[in-house]
Amino acid sequence: MTSADYIHVDIMDGEFVSTKNYDFDDIKLMLDGVSKLLDVHLMVKHPLDYIKDYASLNTKQITFQAEADDDIYETINEIHSYGIKAGLAINPDTPVKQIEKYLDLVDTVLVMSVYPGKGGQKFISETSKKIEELNHYSDLLIEVDGGINKDTIDMASGADMVVSGSYVCESTDYEKAIESLKN
């Protein structure tokens, strides 16, 4: 995937979301030899338990869910202590207003345009309003994840980064799929 700017890695614990994916050692093994920077998304109940491990990889950013159980300030500070960018993700039904007090502390807000935990879902069009709302914060990067494909990419207009899992991974030509999103 030479045309991908980074690799987005979803980590699910089976508690915050019903799906549980691979353990850290499995992820580390899968990513062995991968030179692209990683964008790690912790869809877990206790993100503080995961930061040290994922910071040890080629990680440029760790994002965690605002709805998780750990203290948001402490989690942001822990991520930054490793010299890594901190991102805060919000579910489709979480208003931007709920995370406003953290926006000066994080580097990125990840707008979930589907409910986390399952791939292949349809883009929830109402989440486009959150992108527009977040664009008022000049130093903030906006990332959108969920239901992104060549037909929905325009609904993520205003975002700095998009995550497209199913569309790219289920394509017969990864490079062509990625390029269709960039153009």
Regions found by a protein language model. Give the residues of each.
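Hydrophobic faces of well-ordered beta-strands that scaffold small-molecule active sites
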Residues: 7-9, 38-42, 60-64, 86-90, ...
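Conserved, mostly hydrophobic/aromatic
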Residues: 9-10, 54, 109, 134, ...
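Active-site beta-loop-alpha junctions enriched in small/polar residues
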Residues: 12-14, 43-47, 67, 91-93, ...
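Alpha-helix-loop-beta-strand connector modules within alpha/beta enzyme cores
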Residues: 20-40, 77-89, 125-148, 181-183
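Glycine-rich phosphate-binding active-site loops on the catalytic face of alpha/beta enzymes
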Residues: 62-70, 110-120, 159-178
